[in-house]
């Protein structure tokens, strides 16, 4: 037997979708299936003899599985035992039990749950008996040789025994109710008494109050059964209180049984297999008992030993060998249970033949031959598609193999296997992109494989009474058995329900079913159709009695298959089967596949055809059976009661439509309406839009979509649904439509709907299909009127199956041009939808209208399906033309999303005093509209949904607005042909669709009055949509658009417009105006000096004037809010436009972005920030996910962990124990906040170490209280954000595990959090490469709020695993303690957050204050991404992925796959920020760095605040020094109980000190520290008295720093800061300070200080190990902020280089390059804001170039002028860019866009100089005349770039130039007049696309030209 592993699938009972362990399926990495042989079946044969006789086993469980013809329930011993278990009183006659089960099932699905049966079934799930069996089994097992695996047997049950099946048939329906109803909807009291059976109490069960849960209407919620709850609590209590408490509420809110078991197996059992003896016996005992309770055996409600035997072996395998690579396994399974099944087939010791085990296969599906020829074969393929489920080997040697592509093959003994439609078969399987599947169809023997006979399958045993009559065999072994056996892809609830119902149907087809049973069964099925309207509940072949059917329609015999028919000739499809028996209706739906024939290949190729499937109803007369078949192409007119048979053009009599509009159609219509509404969530929606249909049916519909449309139908097939079924439940209409890929829950495409109206009634006009003359298999689409006359001929063609439909839109357009299409839809008084014609809109006799539009699923989701969608007239009739025929072909959601879903919108609210209050933003959110109106005293609710996009840019939007008074406003807006979208308002009959103009129209239905903007109506609402698809439109309208975007939300003010002339007059000619915001002033001044387009300079002038006016009129707080709102909006618009900028905007859009950061930090506080942010963050209900999300997420997380992290024992640092780690603060005592306890005692981590001894820190971390999380306010540049502060306990515990895992998790390229320097460099290089594919930056909104407890908990447990596996031997005990402590304090059942009204339990969300927040965020983010890719079938298209926090740098193969992926994000409820999302082949953004081909740039505006305010000024104490007062301060509480540390100078209790006093403490206390400092100072003083040797001085300095660091316990970089302070040196200040300023020692100190400054750091330093050495590539530069004096604009960078170590290295780069402030900004943009690391200070400058004083590090002068000293980290520029250049090329460091040089070809070097000039002219873009006028050529030697000089001007002898190979410096004078008037930039050839554009607007241009 072959064993396999797999993951469970989501279901209503498994909402989180973990591996369902009742089917097996722990971590697939635990077990290698290919290593398991058939030896497992026969290794322990004697076990079956002793197992049942064990005295520990109760009598009820000792009946061996092989006992036959003795009903278990009738055994006295078992009855007694059952009585002891509480079940014997309910033991009844076989027929009574069956009827009772049927009645109970009927009551549940028709009237609600039936309570009386629940206690009876509870007693059948008794865990005491299960534990007794476990104990009996374990007594015979050598625990030292036993291992626990995750195995799944071939069958969930052991087959082949008549008696067992008889018992199961009696209780199968009840069992369905037990598993779907009872175990799903139990609630259990939290109180437990000591008499619990598992705690040694009595055998009774008095402590649980079993009742129906309130979640009975939500089948996807599940609570744990009492026994399961108790067993699991017992099991987990032996390890730690990690996941659960004794409350069923936990499971209701977060986890459910299978999830818990999965986590239990994955988390508590190490992935490295260890002997069972490593665990406590009670843990193994409880685990196996829980497995038994929840396994498939529990479903039998029977405690026979055979059930136990078939459950336990899935998980317990015993090994008798210590050699893990070559061990013999056997199952604790009596061989008698399987011996008959294999008696003729498989030898006990045999293994799989090589032919059936190809190398590299990871999954195999073996299917018996008999099943291939059955009508259930397609079902089996679907149900086994997710993993190996059915393995059976035959001795048949006839094997034929056919390869299926590159990932699988089909092997079969069937001769015509090659004739199978392999592509269709392949489409039935779902793959994750990596699996290789073998489909092996094996010849079978009747002795152990069920033969197929009379529509049912029978088991391999004997028939009733020992006969071989298979026709009278046990009916349970029919289709229901197959569903039970192969239902891995069918959830537990559905499969069991189908098992019961199908068994019931097979039962009533036999002769002994009573009429009462049949009636009850039909009622059950009718109720079932309400819950599962699309399941094939009635399907059991096609009896010959079908031909004797006497209904109104007599099908031909060819519609019913026969086994002797060579070929199926199906000519019509069946979508519904309606059966009426005794006035009770049963409805079923057949799948679209035909019946089998002898030639399975012939039958399988006809799978797209469907047949009527009937069943024989016992002994009832067939005359009572009526059915109506509705073909997809049939059309029902509800208003006239007429039904058209489109195939024959005949009208079906209305008398025969008695049952076709019953329950089934209502449910089906609801389903399709839901189908159209649920899955179309896209990335631009905040939350998942829910349908009016109840949420309980969501998983049912989802399963149908995913399994039957995605898997079975396949990507290339689609079923065409009709308009009215989608729009409501009262009408049915069949309309041919275009082929659409129905895939992945329809999220890929909107639904194209053809709306057709005729006259005053609806439905009499329809499209029919008739055969095309002379063409076999092709049908013609025509349109008929209500009299049957053809209105339009040859409208299109369609295949008989209608898989492909092609419409001739040119003919439709010609017909349409003769008709009027305005058909209003008006709600009638009775609420029913009726269509009343607008008589004024019709002309001619036909009165026929045809409107073609799109309705996306979003369109329907806003309305109840039972109500009319439109209640007002609509006049939106876009004209058709010949080009519109491509619309259908181009229709797809990927095209819609890739077209750029952003557009600009502006809403104007007109107040009573005619003031316009504009607001704007992305129209799908309209972020400011509600705020403006609400704060203006009105209430306006707006909802907008994107309804369609035809792929060419045309859009339709539907928006519904509602005011407080209840008045409704609706309007349409559209973009036509990809051109400018201006505005379209409906319903206004006077509005026409015209591009190129803006229409201002009131959105008021009552008052259809044209209103101009110049004449506003008070109280009206206006809207303007603008869509710019051309760069010219953006440039021309940018300034105009920005004028209306200023507003004051808090004060309800309207800012009047400032005309451009008024703005200029206000500003005057000064060119510089103080706006009150220093950073904004400087930045605008910088931009004003740059060579930018004229309209941008005009905009800057206007912007500055606006800011000044607002600052003059309002208070500073109001001004801040106004400008913050306006600038944020400006950033959104500019970034949106930057996504598409390819023309004149180029990359300059980054200069206009992030103006809001120039305002400084938010100056106001928001007291309600905690409630507004923390409540939805941590304490609100979790966001609902689809059921398949959690199973995929769990599988992906485990696979990602094993693929990414290989446990490596810590080697880079000493393996410290946790106690030793607490005493090493240099490993964990970093800067940052933390707190201990509940009081207001905020400590820096250094101060905690200084105040507490190591023992106290150790005790607090492991055994102290667990304080709750604390929310705090954090002001930022653009908002006040809430952060969650965690305690020191969690910090130091997580730090320790991170320290242990340092060598395991470092240097991982999937996240920047774990990257090293080389990987960071490669990331930047990769971002600049832009080779192939598309870039998809995915930024989740409020990422910390997105993960729920399950997502976070999974990675917490996996990290615990990783830490345990990485722990050195010496630290294993410490790691176990830390993990246990973390599991009890940071996992969510025990995690709380402190709010104003008390501590609240954390329900979801990732706290921001954990040490692991960044790591967990990265892991969760990448797992979510891989999960979304798995669910959207786009995993194979991922090219590269890097994450950090909520940002993802993602590269994919194509746009369609990217769109599908992001659409899946929205469908799962994840909010993707639309402002930061796009799909582009040549642009990416990651961590605020924009990447385009050849360059990675930042946002220059973001660096200004950092330059001005955020970075440390050296003249003031470092931030480390400023911490010293805290370090020296000990709270009174600590002072009383904790003795100060003697080895830490600042631990003494002192008053608050400034840093100088702290230095004094450091210098003078304790004595040995002071003495050490004194000795070293004397030594250094004596050594430097003479001329010191630099090498000796360097060595001396290092010894000094090392000794002082060790003595003072100060980190090295903190000590280096102290060494620079003059006060530190005391009496030696004169000599030593001079030494530090003038010798090489100063350079060493400065260089080493550079290591600790902000910027990329060594990866290892984050884990507490010593940081790697970083080269100090820093340059200190000075640039003036005033540019009036020309001499100040030219600065010598060479004189400003502070790092003498690298000065010579960069001399040729910086000596003669002149740098200006705009150039610096561009340079900073090139580097990114993260690399501008230090602002020194503002200084005073004179009119001349100031002299640099290296001692004071200042610029000194007598004059007064503002300037600033900037320290730039150039490592990431020089080393990553400059070093890649050849010695012949010096890059243009001031270049904005790309690294480019102007080259003179070698062929012209020895030619005439004119050719060289011509080459330069072509390269630069100048005219030849201009080149001759402006170029002053200078020479630089090529071979010695370091010694290059540019001082010598090149002579005018051009012949010398021909002999010179080198780099040319081109100096362009900027001031031009007179003869040089043509040298202005515009005439110099500066165009927007030139690479030289906007380098800087200085007096000289620099070009670097390589010869």
Curated annotation (Swiss-Prot):
The segments labelled Disordered in the record are 42-61
Q: Where is the composition biased (Basic and acidic residues)?
A: 44-56
- Coiled-coil intervals: none
- Please give the Gene Ontology molecular function terms for this protein: hydrolase activity; nucleotide binding; RNA binding; RNA-directed RNA polymerase activity
**Alphabetical keyword list:** Hydrolase, Nucleotide-binding, Nucleotidyltransferase, RNA-binding, RNA-directed RNA polymerase, Transferase, Viral RNA replication
Pfam families, per the entry: RdRP_4 (PF02123)
Signal peptide positions are none
Q: Biological process (GO) annotations? A: DNA-templated transcription; viral translational frameshifting
Entry superkingdom = Viruses
Q: Which reaction does it catalyse?
A: RNA(n) + a ribonucleoside 5'-triphosphate = RNA(n+1) + diphosphate
Further information in the entry reads: One molecule or two of Gag capsid protein is replaced in the virion by Gag-Pol because the fusion protein is essential for RNA encapsidation and replication.
Family under the similarity heading: Belongs to the totiviridae RNA-directed RNA polymerase family.
* The protein's role, per its UniProt record: RNA-dependent RNA polymerase which replicates the viral genome. Catalyzes the transcription of fully conservative plus-strand genomic RNAs that are extruded from the virion into the cytoplasm where they function as mRNAs for translation of viral proteins and also as substrates for encapsidation to form new virions. Once encapsidated, the positive strand is converted to dsRNA by the RNA-directed RNA polymerase. Displays ssRNA-binding activity.
The name under which this protein is listed is Probable RNA-directed RNA polymerase
Q: Which organism is it from?
A: Giardia lamblia virus (isolate Wang)
């Amino acid at each position: 037997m072959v064993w396999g592993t797999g993951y469970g699938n989501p279901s209503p009972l498994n909402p989180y979708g973990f591996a369902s362990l009742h089917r097996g399926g722990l971590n697939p990495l635990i077990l290698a299936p290919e290593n398991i042989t058939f030896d497992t079946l026969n290794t322990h044969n004697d076990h079956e003899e002793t197992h049942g006789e064990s005295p520990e086993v109760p009598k009820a469980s000792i009946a061996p599985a092989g006992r036959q013809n003795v009903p278990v329930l009738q055994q006295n011993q078992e009855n007694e035992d059952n009585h002891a278990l509480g079940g014997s009183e309910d033991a009844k006659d076989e027929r009574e039990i069956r009827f009772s089960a049927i009645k109970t099932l009927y009551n549940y699905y028709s009237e609600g749950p039936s309570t009386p049966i629940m206690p009876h079934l509870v007693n059948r799930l008794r865990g005491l008996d299960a534990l007794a069996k476990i104990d009996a089994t374990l007594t015979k097992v050598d625990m030292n040789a036993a291992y626990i695996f995750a195995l799944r047997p071939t069958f969930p049950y052991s087959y082949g025994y008549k008696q067992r099946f008889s018992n199961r048939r009696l209780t199968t329906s009840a069992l369905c109710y037990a598993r779907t109803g009872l175990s799903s909807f139990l609630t259990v009291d939290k109180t437990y008494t000591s008499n619990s059976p598992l705690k040694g109490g009595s055998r009774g069960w008095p402590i649980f109050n079993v009742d129906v849960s309130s979640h009975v209407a939500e089948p996807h919620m599940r609570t744990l059964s009492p026994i399961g709850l108790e067993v699991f609590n017992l099991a987990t209590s032996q390890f730690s209180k990690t996941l659960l408490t004794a409350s069923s509420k936990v499971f209701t809110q977060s986890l459910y049984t299978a999830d818990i078991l999965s986590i239990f197996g994955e988390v508590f059992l190490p992935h490295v297999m260890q002997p069972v003896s490593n665990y406590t016996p009670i843990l193994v005992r409880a685990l196996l008992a829980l497995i038994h309770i929840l396994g498939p055996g529990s479903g039998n409600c029977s405690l026979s030993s055979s059930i136990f035997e078939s459950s336990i072996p899935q998980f317990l395998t015993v090994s008798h060998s210590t050699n893990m690579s070559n061990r013999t396994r056997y199952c604790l399974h009596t061989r008698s249970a399987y011996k008959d099944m294999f008696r003729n087939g498989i030898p006990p010791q045999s293994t799989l033949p090589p032919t059936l085990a190809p190398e590299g296969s990871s999954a195999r599906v073996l299917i018996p031959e008999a099943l291939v020829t059955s009508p259930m074969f397609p079902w089996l393929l679907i149900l086994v598609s997710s993993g190996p489920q059915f393995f059976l080997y035959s001795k048949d040697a006839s094997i034929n193999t056919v390869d299926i592509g590159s990932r699988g093959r089909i092997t079969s003994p069937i001769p015509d296997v090659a004739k199978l439609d392999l592509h269709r078969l392949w489409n039935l399987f779902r793959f994750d992109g990596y699996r290789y599947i073998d489909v092996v169809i094996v010849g079978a023997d009747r002795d152990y494989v069920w033969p197929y006979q009379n529509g049912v399958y029978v088991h391999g045993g004997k028939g009733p009474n020992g006969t071989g009559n298979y026709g009278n065999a046990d009916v349970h072994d029919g289709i229901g058995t197959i569903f039970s056996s192969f239902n891995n892809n069918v959830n537990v609830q559905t499969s069991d329900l189908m098992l019961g119902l199908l068994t019931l149907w097979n039962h009533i087809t036999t002769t002994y079913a009573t009429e009462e049973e049949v009636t009850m069964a039909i009622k059950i099925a009718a109720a079932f159709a309400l819950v599962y309207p699309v399941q094939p509940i009635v399907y059991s072949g096609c009896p010959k009695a079908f031909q004797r059917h006497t209904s109104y329609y007599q099908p031909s015999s060819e519609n019913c298959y026969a086994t002797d028919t060579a070929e199926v000739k199906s000519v019509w499809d069946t979508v519904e089967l309606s059966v009426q028996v005794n006035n009770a209706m049963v409805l079923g739906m057949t799948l679209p596949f035909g019946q089998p024939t002898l030639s399975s290949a012939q039958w399988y190729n006809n799978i797209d055809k469907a047949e009527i499937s009937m069943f024989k109803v016992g002994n009832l007369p067939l005359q009572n059976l009526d059915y109506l078949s509705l073909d997809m192409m049939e059309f029902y007119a509800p208003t006239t009661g007429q039904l058209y048979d489109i195939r024959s053009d005949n009208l079906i009599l209305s008398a025969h439509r008695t049952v076709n509009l019953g329950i089934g159609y209502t449910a089906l219509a609801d389903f399709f309406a839901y189908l159209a509404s649920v899955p179309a969530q896209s990335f631009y929606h905040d939350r998942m839009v829910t349908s009016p249909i109840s949420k309980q049916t969501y998983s049912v519909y989802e399963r149908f979509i995913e399994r039957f449309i995605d898997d079975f139908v396949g990507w290339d097939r689609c079923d065409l649904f009709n308009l009215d079924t989608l729009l409501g439940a009262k009408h049915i209409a069949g309309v041919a439509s275009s082929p659409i890929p129905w895939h992945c829950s329809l999220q890929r495409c909107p639904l194209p709907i053809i709306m057709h109206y005729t006259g005053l009634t609806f439905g009499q006009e329809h499209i029919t299909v008739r055969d095309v003359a002379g063409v076999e298999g092709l049908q013609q689409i025509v349109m008929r009127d209500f009299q049957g006359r053809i209105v339009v001929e040859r409208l299109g063609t369609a295949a008989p199956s209608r898989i492909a439909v092609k419409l001739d839109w040119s003919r439709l357009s010609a017909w349409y041009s003769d008709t009027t299409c305005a058909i209003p839809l008006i709600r009638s008084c009775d609420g029913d939808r009726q269509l009343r014609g607008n008589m004024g809109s019709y002309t001619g006799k036909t009165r026929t209208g045809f409107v073609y539009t799109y309705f996306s699923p979003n369109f329907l989701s806003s309305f109840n399906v039972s109500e009319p969608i439109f209640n007002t007239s609509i006049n939106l009739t876009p004209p058709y033309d010949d080009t519109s025929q491509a619309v259908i072909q181009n229709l797809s959601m990927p095209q819609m999303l890739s077209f750029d879903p952003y557009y600009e919108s502006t809403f104007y609210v007109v107040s009573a005093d005619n003031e316009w209050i504009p607001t704007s933003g992305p129209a799908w959110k309209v972020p400011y509209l509600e705020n403006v109106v609400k704060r203006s005293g009105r209430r306006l609710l707006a909802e907008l949904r994107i309804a369609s996009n035809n792929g060419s840019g045309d859009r339709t939007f539907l928006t519904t607005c509602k005011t407080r008074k209840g008045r409704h406003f609706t309007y349409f807006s559209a973009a036509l042909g990809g051109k400018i979208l201006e505005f379209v308002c409906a319903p206004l009959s006077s509005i026409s669709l015209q591009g190129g103009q803006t229409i201002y129209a009131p959105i008021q239905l009552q008052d259809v009055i044209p209103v101009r903007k110049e004449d506003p109506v008070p109280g009206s609402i206006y809207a303007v949509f603008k869509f710019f698809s051309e760069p010219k439109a953006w440039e021309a309208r940018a300034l105009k658009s920005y004028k209306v975007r200023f507003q004051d939300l808090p004060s309800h003010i309207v800012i009047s417009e400032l005309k451009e002339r008024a703005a200029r007059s206000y500003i005057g000619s000064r060119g510089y105006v103080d706006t009150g915001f220093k950073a904004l002033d400087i930045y605008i001044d910088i931009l004003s000096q740059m060579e930018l387009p004229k309209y941008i300079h005009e905009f800057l002038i206007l912007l500055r004037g606006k800011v000044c006016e607002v600052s003059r009129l309002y208070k500073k707080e109001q001004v801040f809010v106004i400008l913050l709102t306006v600038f944020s909006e400006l950033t959104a618009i500019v970034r949106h436009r930057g996504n598409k900028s390819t023309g004149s905007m180029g990359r300059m859009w980054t200069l206009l972005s992030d103006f809001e950061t120039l305002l400084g930090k938010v100056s106001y506080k928001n007291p309600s920030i905690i409630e507004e942010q923390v409540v939805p963050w941590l304490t609100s209900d979790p966001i609902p996910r689809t059921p398949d999300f959690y199973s995929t997420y769990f599988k992906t997380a485990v696979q990602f962990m094993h693929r990414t992290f290989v446990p490596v024992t810590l080697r880079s640092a000493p393996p410290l124990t946790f106690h030793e780690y607490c005493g090493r603060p240099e490993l964990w005592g970093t800067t940052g906040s933390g707190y201990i306890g509940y009081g207001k005692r905020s400590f820096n981590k250094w101060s905690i170490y200084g105040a507490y001894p190591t023992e106290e820190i150790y005790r607090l971390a492991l055994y102290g209280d667990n304080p709750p999380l604390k929310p705090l306010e954090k002001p930022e540049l653009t908002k006040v954000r809430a952060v969650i502060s965690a305690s020191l306990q969690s910090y130091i515990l997580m730090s320790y595990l991170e320290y242990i895992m340092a060598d395991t998790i470092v240097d991982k390229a999937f996240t920047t959090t774990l990257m090293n320097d080389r990987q960071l460099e490669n990331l930047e290089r990769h971002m600049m490469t832009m080779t192939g594919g598309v870039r998809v930056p995915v930024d989740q909104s409020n990422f910390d709020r997105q993960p729920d407890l399950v997502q976070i908990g999974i990675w917490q447990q996996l990290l615990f695993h990783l830490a345990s596996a990485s722990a050195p031997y010496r630290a294993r005990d410490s790691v176990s303690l830390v993990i246990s402590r973390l599991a009890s304090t940071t996992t969510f059942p025990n995690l709380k957050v402190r709010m104003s009204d008390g501590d609240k339990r954390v329900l979801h969300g990732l706290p921001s204050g954990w040490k692991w927040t960044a790591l967990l965020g990265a892991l969760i983010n990448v797992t979510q991404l891989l999960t979304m890719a798995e669910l959207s079938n786009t995993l194979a298209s991922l090219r590269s992925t890097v994450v950090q926090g909520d940002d993802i740098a993602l590269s994919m193969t194509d746009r369609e796959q990217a769109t599908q992926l992001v659409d899946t994000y929205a469908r799962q409820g994840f909010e993707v920020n639309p402002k930061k999302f796009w799909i582009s082949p040549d642009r990416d953004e990651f961590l605020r760095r924009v990447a385009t081909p050849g360059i990675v740039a930042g946002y220059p505006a973001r660096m200004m605040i950092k330059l001005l305010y955020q970075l440390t000024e050296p003249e003031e104490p470092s931030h480390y020094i400023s911490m010293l007062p805290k370090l020296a301060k000990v709270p009174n509480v600590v002072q009383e109980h904790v003795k100060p540390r003697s080895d830490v100078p600042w631990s003494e209790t002192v008053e608050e000190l400034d840093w100088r006093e702290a230095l004094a403490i450091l210098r003078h206390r304790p004595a040995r520290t002071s003495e050490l400092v004194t000795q070293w100072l004397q030594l250094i003083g004596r050594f430097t008295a003479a001329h010191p040797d630099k090498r000796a001085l360097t060595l001396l300095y290092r010894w000094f720093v090392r000794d002082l660091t060790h003595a003072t316990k100060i980190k090295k970089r903190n000590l280096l800061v102290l060494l620079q302070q003059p006060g530190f040196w005391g009496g030696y200040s004169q000599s030593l300070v001079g030494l530090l300023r003038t010798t090489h020692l100063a350079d060493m100190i400065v260089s080493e200080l550079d290591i600790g400054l902000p910027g990329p750091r060594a990866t290892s330093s984050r884990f507490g190990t010593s940081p790697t050495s970083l080269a100090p590539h820093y340059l200190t530069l000075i640039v003036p902020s005033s540019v009036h004096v020309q001499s100040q604009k030219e600065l010598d960078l060479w004189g400003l280089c502070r790092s003498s170590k690298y000065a010579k290295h960069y001399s040729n780069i910086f000596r003669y390059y002149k740098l200006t402030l705009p150039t610096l900004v561009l340079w900073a943009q090139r580097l990114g804001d993260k690399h501008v690391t230090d602002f020194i200070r503002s200084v005073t400058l004179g009119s001349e170039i100031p002299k640099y004083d290296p001692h004071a590090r200042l610029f000194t002068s007598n004059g007064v002028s503002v300037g600033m000293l900037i320290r730039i980290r150039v490592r990431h520029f020089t080393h990553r860019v400059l070093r890649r250049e050849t010695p012949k090329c010096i890059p243009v460091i001031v270049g904005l866009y790309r690294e480019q040089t102007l080259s003179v070809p070698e062929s012209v070097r020895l030619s005439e100089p004119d050719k060289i000039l011509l080459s330069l002219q072509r390269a630069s873009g100048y005219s030849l005349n201009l080149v001759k006028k402006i170029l002053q050529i200078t020479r630089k030697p090529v071979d010695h770039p370091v010694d290059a000089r540019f001082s010598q001007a090149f002579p005018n002898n051009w012949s010398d130039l021909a002999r010179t190979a080198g780099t040319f410096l081109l100096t362009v004078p900027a001031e031009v007049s007179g003869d040089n008037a043509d040298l202005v930039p515009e005439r110099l050839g500066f165009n927007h696309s030139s690479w030289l554009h906007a380098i800087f607007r200085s007096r000289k241009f620099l070009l670097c030209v390589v010869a």
